[in-house]
Amino acid sequence: MSEVKRTQQGRVVSDKMDKSITVAIERFVKHPIYGKFVKRTTKVHAHDENNECGIGDTVEIAECRPLSKTKSWTLVKVVEKAKM
């Protein structure tokens, strides 16, 4: 049986590490009392084998086995490069 891998889209906020990127994933959550949709951000570390991502790129990442203490996502593809 094959597992369905969880994928997310997000924006690269840091690429200072070697073969690693920090991706900010935005989601909208409904406020429990007021009902307004509020933007929430989650930051995750992802593995970038070829160091191809830059700050501001929109990327797709997939969940994988833990690669380090904080890194358990891997880069699938760069959806859109950042405008310089």
Swiss-Prot record:
The keyword Transmembrane appears for this protein: no
Gene3D superfamilies found in the cross-reference section: Nucleic acid-binding proteins
Pfam families reported for this sequence: Ribosomal_S17
Highest taxon, organism lineage: Bacteria
Keyword Ribonucleoprotein: yes
GO MF annotation, one: rRNA binding
Annotated PROSITE patterns: RIBOSOMAL_S17
Keywords, comma-separated and alphabetical: Ribonucleoprotein, Ribosomal protein, RNA-binding, rRNA-binding
HAMAP family per record: Ribosomal_uS17_B
Described function: One of the primary rRNA binding proteins, it binds specifically to the 5'-end of 16S ribosomal RNA.
Sequence similarity: Belongs to the universal ribosomal protein uS17 family.
Name this protein carries in UniProt: Small ribosomal subunit protein uS17
Source organism of this protein record: Vibrio parahaemolyticus serotype O3:K6 (strain RIMD 2210633)
